[in-house]
């Protein structure tokens, strides 16, 4: 069994049918899935994107907002999601802490890896917000970095599909699921598991990545217990 994992959710996942903002029903569902991991003795870290609030690349597209500023706006979006997730976890009776890569002490702790490790020892879920704290880096890269820093045995990317495909399954009915694939193939074939920086960082640190459908109840627990039938593994 994987003892410590980091789960990465997209910001869009929180938006639900509206496509923006936060759907509390989805938030509650995710918190319940995380609770099942904690109840099975798993130490859990979470990273959430900010696409339901604002996407840096999109905000900077027409040049009115500089890319660096747009990326910082995106980081703030991830903190909004982190605060919401912390509340949802506590609503379920779990203890949670939000740590951010940009200091904002009134609402979150600054990211300190040793402090995060102490939280795990005390059974707390740790949410990492504000990405890496630097523009031009995605939240996927931030998740990979944090997973490496805390010594996670696996990074789980919770998405809308049950794994990695050779082409977009939403567009191509004949898309083939890849049960396992190497970091090198993901990079060379441009298979969009995560961005190239995140994949390269995972490769350098031998961090396996599981890609699964977050909407199938129990998938996260199956994966941490070693059942990879409902996911794809990049290693």
Curated annotation (Swiss-Prot):
Q: Which domain of life is it from?
A: Bacteria
- The name of this protein is Uridylate kinase
Q: Where is this region: Involved in allosteric activation by GTP?
A: 16-21
Q: What class of enzyme is it?
A: transferase
Localisation: Cytoplasm
- This entry's Enzyme Commission designation comes to 2.7.4.22
Q: Name one GO biological process term.
A: UDP biosynthetic process
Query: Where along this sequence does the record place binding of UMP?
Result: 50, 71, 132-139
């Amino acid at each position: 069994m994987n003892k410590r994992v980091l789960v990465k959710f997209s910001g869009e996942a929180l938006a639900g049918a509206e496509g923006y903002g936060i759907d509390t029903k989805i938030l509650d569902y995710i918190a319940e899935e995380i609770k099942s991991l904690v109840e099975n003795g798993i130490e859990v870290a979470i990273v959430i994107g900010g696409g339901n609030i604002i996407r840096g690349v999109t905000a900077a597209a027409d040049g009115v907002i500089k890319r660096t500023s747009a990326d910082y706006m995106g980081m703030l979006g991830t903190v909004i999601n982190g605060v919401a997730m912390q509340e949802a976890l506590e609503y379920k009776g779990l203890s949670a802490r939000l740590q951010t890569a940009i200091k904002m002490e009134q609402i979150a702790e600054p990211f300190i890896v040793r402090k995060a490790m102490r939280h795990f020892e005390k059974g707390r879920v740790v949410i990492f917000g504000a990405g890496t704290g630097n523009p031009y880096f995605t939240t996927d890269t931030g998740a990979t970095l944090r997973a490496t820093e805390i010594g996670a045995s696996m990074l789980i990317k919770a998405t809308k599909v049950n794994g990695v495909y050779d082409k977009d399954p939403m567009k191509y009915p004949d898309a083939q699921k890849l049960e396992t694939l190497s970091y090198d193939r993901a990079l060379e074939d441009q298979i969009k598991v995560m961005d190239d920086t995140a994949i390269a960082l995972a490769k350098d640190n031998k961090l396996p990545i599981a890609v699964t459908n977050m909407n199938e109840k129990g998938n996260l627990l199956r994966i941490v217990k070693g059942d990879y039938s409902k996911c794809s593994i990049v290693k």
